[in-house]
From Swiss-Prot:
GO cellular component: cytosolic large ribosomal subunit
Entry similarity comment: Belongs to the universal ribosomal protein uL14 family.
Role summary: Binds to 23S rRNA. Forms part of two intersubunit bridges in the 70S ribosome.
UniProt keyword list: Ribonucleoprotein, Ribosomal protein, RNA-binding, rRNA-binding
Annotated protein name in UniProt: Large ribosomal subunit protein uL14
Subunit text: Part of the 50S ribosomal subunit. Forms a cluster with proteins L3 and L19. In the 70S ribosome, L14 and L19 interact and together make contacts with the 16S rRNA in bridges B5 and B8.
Domain of life: Bacteria
Gene Ontology MF, one: structural constituent of ribosome
């Protein structure tokens, strides 16, 4: 469950290391985002000479949460960190690599690129 002010790790090679959620998209008073939801983030920490700079406001999709996600069979998938992948205005990842596992819940039409780049799909 990601909400406003939540700090997330970045699971791609866009150059950002940490981002902060500034808005959960999808509804005027929506409070929480889970895996597969799009959020508005600001870059808090970035590496030098990267595609994104500190202070940039971007869209991102949540790929891992500590809270976890419940599957229809009753199992729960939890991770050790909250992580996101930074998107461009067309909802496509700006990075060319994804780090760490992602969940099968991202397997929708708009996030198939993330699934194909990920080293492991749980």
């Amino acid at each position: 469950m990601i909400q406003t002010e939540t700090m997330l790790d970045v699971a791609d090679n866009s150059g950002a290391r940490r981002v902060q959620c500034i808005k959960v998209l999808g509804g005027s008073h929506r409070r929480y985002a889970s895996v597969g939801d799009i959020i508005k983030v600001t870059v808090k920490e970035a590496i030098p000479r990267a595609r994104v700079k500190k202070g940039d406001v971007m869209n991102a999709v949540v790929v891992r949460t500590k809270f976890g996600i419940r599957r229809p069979d009753g199992s729960v998938i939890r991770f050790d960190d909250n992580a996101a992948v930074i998107l461009n205005n067309n909802k496509a990842p700006i990075a060319t690599r994804i780090f760490g596992p992602v969940t099968r819940e991202l397997r929708t039409e708009q996030f198939m690129k993330i699934i194909s780049l990920a080293p492991e799909v749980l």
